[in-house]
C-alpha cells in the first residue's frame, strides 16, 4: 500500500477533511485526518496495521501501547498481528497515565502506536511514562505523520502515510484571521478551551 492509494482510501471513506480545524495539539490546520473513519473498516484496519507490524516484526516487541483514544484501535490491531500484549495510556487530571490494571515492567520492549502525529506531544508523554517505568522503547508507529518525518520521537519511527500538512499556531492562523468558523473534532476537543 503506497501513499497515493492510502490517500484514496482516506478520501473514499470521508476521513480526509478540509476546512478549519483545531488539532489535538492545539494548532490549527485546513486539513484533518479522521483515522477512525478508515480504521472502522476491517480490511483497511488490517492492511494499515500490517504495514506497521511488518516494519517492527523483527524487533522483539513485548508490548504495544497507544495513547487514548486515537491510537487504541491501530495499537490493538498491530499488537494482535504481532501476537503481543496491547495496552493504552490515558489522561487523568490532564496527565498521561497507565491505569486499568495495565503495567509495564523494567526491560520490557514496548512499541508505541498512534493514529496521527502532528507535534508528537501525546506520544512523547507516553515515551516519558515508559522511560520512568524502565521500559525499552522499540519504536513509534503511526497511521499518519503530518510532519513528513520532521517530528522525530525515536530512532525507529514508521508511518503508513507521511506528508507535510501545514498547521499554524492559533495566533498566526490565516483561517482565523479570515473569520472562518473552526471545528475541533479531536479526542481532546471537549477538554480544551
Curated annotation (Swiss-Prot):
UniProt superkingdom: Bacteria
One GO BP: pyrimidine nucleobase biosynthetic process
Annotated positions binding orotate: 118, 146
CDD domains named in the record: PRTases_typeI
Catalytic activity: orotidine 5'-phosphate + diphosphate = orotate + 5-phospho-alpha-D-ribose 1-diphosphate
Enzyme class: transferase
Sequence positions that bind 5-phospho-alpha-D-ribose 1-diphosphate: 114-122
Listed InterPro entries: OPRT (IPR023031), Orotate_PRibTrfase_bac (IPR006273), PRibTrfase_dom (IPR000836), PRTase-like (IPR029057)
Keyword line: Glycosyltransferase, Magnesium, Pyrimidine biosynthesis, Transferase
Cofactor: Mg(2+)
Pathway assignment: Pyrimidine metabolism; UMP biosynthesis via de novo pathway; UMP from orotate: step 1/2
PROSITE patterns in the cross-refs: PUR_PYR_PR_TRANSFER
GO molecular function: magnesium ion binding; orotate phosphoribosyltransferase activity
Enzyme Commission code: 2.4.2.10
Similarity comment: Belongs to the purine/pyrimidine phosphoribosyltransferase family. PyrE subfamily.
HAMAP family assigned to the protein according to its UniProt record, in alphabetical order: PyrE
SUBUNIT field: Homodimer.
Known function: Catalyzes the transfer of a ribosyl phosphate group from 5-phosphoribose 1-diphosphate to orotate, leading to the formation of orotidine monophosphate (OMP).
Protein name stated in the entry: Orotate phosphoribosyltransferase
Amino acid at each position: 500500500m503506497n501513499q497515493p492509494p492510502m490517500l484514496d482510501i482516506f478520501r473514499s471513506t470521508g476521513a480526509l477533511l478540509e476546512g478549519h480545524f483545531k488539532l489535538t495539539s492545539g494548532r490549527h490546520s485546513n486539513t484533518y485526518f479522521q483515522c477512525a473513519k478508515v480504521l472502522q473498516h476491517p480490511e483497511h484496519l488490517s492492511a494499515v496495521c500490517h504495514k506497521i507490524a511488518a516494519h517492527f516484526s523483527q524487533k522483539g516487541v513485548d508490548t504495544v501501547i497507544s495513547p487514548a483514544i486515537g491510537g487504541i484501535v491501530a495499537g490493538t490491531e498491530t499488537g494482535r498481528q504481532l501476537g503481543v500484549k496491547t495496552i493504552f495510556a490515558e489522561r487523568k487530571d490532564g496527565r498521561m497515565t497507565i491505569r486499568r490494571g495495565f503495567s509495564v515492567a523494567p526491560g520490557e520492549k514496548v512499541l508505541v502506536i498512534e493514529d496521527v502525529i502532528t507535534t508528537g506531544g501525546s506520544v512523547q508523554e507516553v515515551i516519558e511514562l515508559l522511560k520512568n517505568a524502565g521500559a525499552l522503547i522499540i519504536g513509534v508507529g503511526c497511521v499518519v505523520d503530518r510532519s513528513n518525518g520532521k517530528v522525530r520521537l525515536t530512532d525507529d519511527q514508521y508511518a503508513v502515510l507521511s506528508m507535510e500538512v501545514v498547521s499554524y499556531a492559533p495566533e498566526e492562523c490565516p483561517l482565523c484571521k479570515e473569520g472562518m468558523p473552526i471545528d475541533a473534532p479531536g479526542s481532546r476537543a471537549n477538554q480544551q478551551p
